[in-house]
């Protein structure tokens, strides 16, 4: 990513030589419940604006919230998976502020009494090691409405002529997961931030509590960054970069803020405690001066009883926690017999779960890995999308592999079939038939092509007859070209050698 042309940044190596970064990550996750946090409105994504609302989520006078028990259970499962203590008693609070995204002028959240506290998550790093990130708390709250600003170059409110509000998202259940300060990371701080959010995404996906689609806003990361001079104990003033919407952007935003803040401090300036916006070009810009807890005038929510999860409920939910993704991957790596480097490449490409699903449909793991880890990664990169966003399913990849194993396709022809599936031309066998790609398995047809190629290249044929077996490659190439790659190259070679008395 490029950065703003007028950005004043310190060289990254100089930053690390002079400062220690301190990170704090706040991740908001929309839960995959059927209804909202405090009312019966659906949480389905993508509906027409303001069609999934009611008096509760619109904050109309006299409406009262009713707590979604499924959201509470999801919060407990998340806390358990993050090695948190599930408290025996917690309650909601009103976070008071005036902004159009919440029409009742307060958000129901949890302030000083969250449902889960004091956990940790081991984040796998690129070099095969892990970094333990301590979790301060995970608390429940409701999401806000979505504002769309019209007329500004940046899509933000500054310079906009019109702002549109969609309250469909208002009241959707959220879990906010807040880390304790991450210190001692040094030059690896940006990588650790990305690794933590990646590990958290994978964990939540394995739990089935959220679709964790950062591109759709169901998982959002706020990155707090501050610097302190090497050797000092006191933390610096932090900034909070809001709503970073991709894993790579988390890393870029943290690195940028480290370089920007270092340049400000080195020039004698002071860091302003503020929120900042992340831009896809790779830089941040000022938002608003950061509020403190006192600004929000928190007080206990009077319309909701405290939440007191029983020990029996917690233990029952503990039994539903699946194998952690990184442990599952280690086991799978051993089953597949691949190196740490190969496994990291598959993980970084987002291919592991897709390979597993392909194997479930009958494909050998080696071939499934080859397709998802090579050709399909290239196609995803060309389209600038995630691997799981490609227009092909694990079942379809398994079907292509089966066609190769059955001798109906070569690997080269199989790639053409996959391209057809990606283009929406149908199932693999339909694409193969429609494009006429099935391998020629009739020896009489192949033999005729071999005879024609030998007749057209008498000098090469004579070399083969004289014992220069390597020369057969030229004839095989001519036959493959004549048959548009639909002949079996190994069988063509056999027929060429036999025709020249070398079989």
From Swiss-Prot:
Q: Name one GO biological process term.
A: translation
Tell me which SUPFAM superfamilies the record gives: GatB/YqeY motif, Glutamine synthetase/guanido kinase
- Decide whether keyword Nucleotide-binding is in the record: yes
Q: What top-level branch of life does the organism fall under?
A: Bacteria
Q: What does this protein do?
A: Allows the formation of correctly charged Asn-tRNA(Asn) or Gln-tRNA(Gln) through the transamidation of misacylated Asp-tRNA(Asn) or Glu-tRNA(Gln) in organisms which lack either or both of asparaginyl-tRNA or glutaminyl-tRNA synthetases. The reaction takes place in the presence of glutamine and ATP through an activated phospho-Asp-tRNA(Asn) or phospho-Glu-tRNA(Gln).
Please describe the quaternary structure of this protein.
Heterotrimer of A, B and C subunits.
Family assignment from sequence similarity = Belongs to the GatB/GatE family. GatB subfamily.
> What is the name of this protein?
Aspartyl/glutamyl-tRNA(Asn/Gln) amidotransferase subunit B
């Amino acid at each position: 990513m490029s950065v703003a042309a007028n950005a004043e940044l310190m060289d990254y190596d100089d930053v690390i030589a002079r400062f220690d970064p301190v990170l704090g990550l706040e991740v908001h996750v929309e839960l995959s419940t059927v209804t909202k946090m405090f009312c019966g409105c659906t949480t389905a994504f993508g509906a027409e604006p303001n069609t999934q609302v009611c008096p509760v989520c619109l904050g109309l006078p006299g409406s009262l919230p009713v707590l979604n028990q499924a959201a509470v259970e999801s919060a407990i499962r998340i806390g358990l998976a993050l090695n948190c203590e599930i408290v025996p008693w917690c309650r909601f609070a009103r976070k008071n502020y005036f902004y159009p995204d919440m029409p009742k002028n307060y958000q129901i959240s949890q302030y000083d009494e969250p449902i889960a506290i004091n956990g940790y998550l081991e984040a796998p790093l690129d070099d095969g090691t892990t970094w333990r990130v301590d979790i301060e708390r995970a608390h429940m709250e409701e999401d806000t409405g979505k504002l769309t600003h019209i007329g500004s170059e940046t899509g933000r409110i500054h310079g906009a002529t019109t702002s549109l509000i969609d309250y469909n998202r208002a009241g959707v259940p959220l879990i906010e997961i807040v880390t304790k300060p991450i210190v001692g990371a040094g030059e690896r701080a940006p990588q650790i931030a990305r690794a933590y959010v990646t590990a958290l995404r994978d964990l939540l996906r394995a739990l089935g509590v959220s679709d964790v689609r950062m591109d759709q806003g169901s998982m959002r990361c706020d990155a707090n960054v501050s610097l302190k001079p090497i050797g000092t104990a006191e933390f610096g003033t932090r900034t909070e970069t809001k709503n970073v919407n991709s894993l790579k952007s988390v890393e870029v935003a943290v690195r940028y803020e480290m370089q920007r803040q270092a340049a400000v401090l080195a020039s004698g300036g002071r860091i302003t405690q503020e929120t900042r916006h992340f831009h896809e070009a790779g830089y941040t810009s000022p938002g608003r001066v950061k509020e403190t807890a006192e600004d929000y005038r928190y007080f206990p929510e009077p319309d909701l009883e405290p939440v007191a999860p029983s020990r029996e409920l917690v233990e029952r939910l503990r039994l539903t926690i699946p194998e952690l993704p990184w442990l599952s991957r280690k086991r799978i790596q051993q089953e597949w017999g691949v190196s740490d480097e190969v496994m990291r490449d598959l993980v970084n490409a987002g291919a592991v779960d897709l390979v597993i699903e392909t194997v479930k449909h009958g494909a050998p793991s080696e071939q499934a890995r080859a397709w998802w880890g090579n050709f399909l990664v290239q196609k995803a990169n060309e389209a600038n999308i995630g691997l799981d966003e490609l227009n092909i399913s694990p079942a379809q990849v398994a079907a292509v592999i089966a066609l190769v194993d059955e001798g109906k396709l070569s690997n080269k022809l199989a790639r053409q079939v996959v391209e057809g599936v990606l283009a929406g031309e149908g199932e693999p066998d339909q694409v193969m038939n429609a494009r006429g790609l099935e391998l020629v398995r009739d020896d009489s047809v192949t033999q005729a092509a071999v005879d024609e190629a030998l007749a057209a290249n008498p000098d090469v044929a004579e070399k083969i007859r004289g014992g220069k077996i390597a020369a057969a490659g030229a004839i095989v190439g001519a036959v493959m070209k004549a048959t548009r790659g639909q002949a079996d190259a190994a069988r063509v070679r056999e027929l060429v050698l036999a025709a020249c008395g070398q079989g």
